[in-house]
């Protein structure tokens, strides 16, 4: 019998890990430079915690039960877990809270594909306790800084505003609103043309479908929809944000007020980070503002504003593969320490440890019993080990540089 990983699971071998760590280390450096601190939440959550935001479908959660028959689930995303942790464990801390994570998530994918991946790796940030223009700009600029740090050039940010989109949908009859929303989310003009709408509402839906493109053009189009005071204020805030982002130089934005995320706890900004390739556009991450989510977990129901984004490590990996930036092999050891005979075993361990205690990271291997010097040298060449220390019984070393 050949034992394989469970369906939807996979192993990461040393080179996979080195490449994943390269991406994560670059992102972590950016998070630290912006003043964010890492948070680690439980992989297991109570199902009522995961379902509280009404944004996660129960069937996508991989569920478990404990000995008390309590329903548990493997987290399908991080924001709900962090929201729960912040209001229950960090309530006395001052805001804003700048948090980042680097973790795995689990999702049951209901598609007709055998062994569809169910474990994913993500990195992201949450900025909690503050709303407004500057907080929104910080998170978007931080996302752009992450991509720049990874050496990615051909990306853009698709920016929407869930509050504006929802309020524009309020003009439609309640019994048709969900269908109009779905049609706009999927850019489905045929459905818009066939729904039983008045001419005025049908034209409104068509305009909403076209609220995508250059920021100045989109803002002009949405202003033609006879907005009320609240909607106009939201549009003005969006305009101020775009102007701030673009004032610092080129920041690639596509404004899209038809952008509707599948996770429905967003109350303001929503965005996707997209990379352009010759063959397709790949979504590298997404995020948005969720000013009512934390209130669902707060004992007194107090709303705490929040905004964040997540980057998908696997998608970043696929894009970076073609750039030749990722490590192409695992790090080589610096030394191979070889006891020349059994009497030198203790001295060899001591010498290897002395090398390892260097202030700089030094990778040191000990030969574990090879008797043929030619075999030892070939091993060092195959593993790109720079130096061999041959240890005599009296502890004295003979250093040999390995020609590659």
UniProtKB/Swiss-Prot annotation:
What is the name attached to this protein's record?
A: ATP phosphoribosyltransferase regulatory subunit
User: According to its record, what are the GO cellular component terms?
Assistant: cytoplasm
Principal localization reads cytoplasm
One Gene Ontology MF term = histidine-tRNA ligase activity
| Other comment | This function is generally fulfilled by the C-terminal part of HisG, which is missing in some bacteria such as this one.
* Pathway entry: Amino-acid biosynthesis; L-histidine biosynthesis; L-histidine from 5-phospho-alpha-D-ribose 1-diphosphate: step 1/9
Xref: InterPro entries: aa-tRNA-synth_II, aa-tRNA-synth_II/BPL/LPL, HisRS-like_core, HisRS/HisZ, HisZ
Query: Whom does it interact with, and what assembly results?
Result: Heteromultimer composed of HisG and HisZ subunits.
Q: Which UniProt keywords apply?
A: Amino-acid biosynthesis, Cytoplasm, Histidine biosynthesis
A single Pfam family it belongs to is tRNA-synt_His
Q: Name one GO biological process term.
A: histidyl-tRNA aminoacylation
The family database entries (NCBIfam families) matched by this protein are listed as: hisZ_biosyn_reg (TIGR00443), PRK12292.2-3 (NF008940)
PANTHER family according to UniProt: HISTIDINE--TRNA LIGASE, MITOCHONDRIAL-RELATED (PTHR43707:SF1), HISTIDYL-TRNA SYNTHETASE (PTHR43707)
This protein's record includes keyword Transport? no
The record lists the lineage as: Bacteria, Bacillati, Cyanobacteriota, Cyanophyceae, Nostocales
The job of this chain, per UniProt, is described as: Required for the first step of histidine biosynthesis. May allow the feedback regulation of ATP phosphoribosyltransferase activity by histidine.
């Amino acid at each position: 019998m050949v034992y394989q990983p469970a369906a939807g699971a996979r192993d990461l071998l040393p080179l996979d890990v080195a490449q994943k760590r390269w991406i994560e280390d670059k992102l972590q450096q950016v998070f630290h430079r912006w003043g964010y601190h890492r948070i680690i939440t439980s992989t297991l959550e109570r199902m009522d915690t995961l379902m509280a935001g009404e944004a996660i479908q129960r069937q996508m959660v991989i569920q478990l039960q404990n000995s008390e028959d309590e329903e548990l689930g493997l987290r399908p995303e991080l924001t709900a877990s962090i929201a729960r942790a912040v209001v229950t464990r960090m309530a006395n801390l001052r805001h804003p809270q700048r948090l980042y994570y680097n973790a795995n998530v689990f999702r049951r994918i209901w598609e007709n594909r055998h062994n569809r991946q169910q474990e994913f790796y993500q990195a992201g940030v949450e900025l909690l306790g503050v709303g407004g223009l500057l907080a929104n700009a910080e998170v978007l600029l931080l996302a752009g800084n992450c991509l720049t740090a990874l050496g990615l050039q051909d990306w853009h940010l698709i920016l929407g505003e869930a509050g504006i989109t929802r309020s524009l949908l309020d003009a439609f009859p309640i019994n048709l609103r969900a269908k109009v929303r779905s049609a706009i989310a999927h850019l489905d003009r045929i459905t818009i043309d066939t729904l039983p709408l008045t001419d005025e509402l049908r034209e409104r839906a068509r305009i909403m479908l076209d609220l995508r493109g250059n920021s100045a053009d989109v803002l002009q189009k949405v202003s033609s929809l006879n907005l009320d005071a609240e909607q106009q204020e939201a549009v003005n805030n969006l305009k101020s944000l775009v102007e701030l982002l673009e004032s610092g130089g080129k920041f690639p934005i596509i404004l899209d007020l038809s952008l509707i995320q599948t996770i429905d706890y967003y109350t303001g900004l929503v965005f996707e980070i997209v990379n352009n390739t010759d063959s397709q556009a790949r979504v590298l991450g997404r995020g948005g503002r969720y000013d009512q989510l934390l209130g669902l977990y707060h004992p007194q129901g107090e709303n705490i504003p929040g905004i964040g984004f997540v980057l998908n490590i696997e998608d970043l990996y696929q894009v970076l593969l073609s750039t030749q930036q990722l490590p192409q092999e695992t790090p080589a050891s610096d030394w191979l320490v070889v006891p020349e005979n059994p009497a030198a075993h203790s001295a060899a361990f001591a010498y290897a440890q002395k090398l390892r205690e260097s202030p700089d990271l030094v990778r040191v291997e000990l030969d574990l019993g090879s008797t043929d010097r030619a075999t030892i040298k070939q091993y060092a060449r195959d593993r790109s080990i720079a130096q061999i220390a041959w240890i005599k019984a009296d502890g004295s070393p003979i250093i040999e540089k390995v020609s590659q």
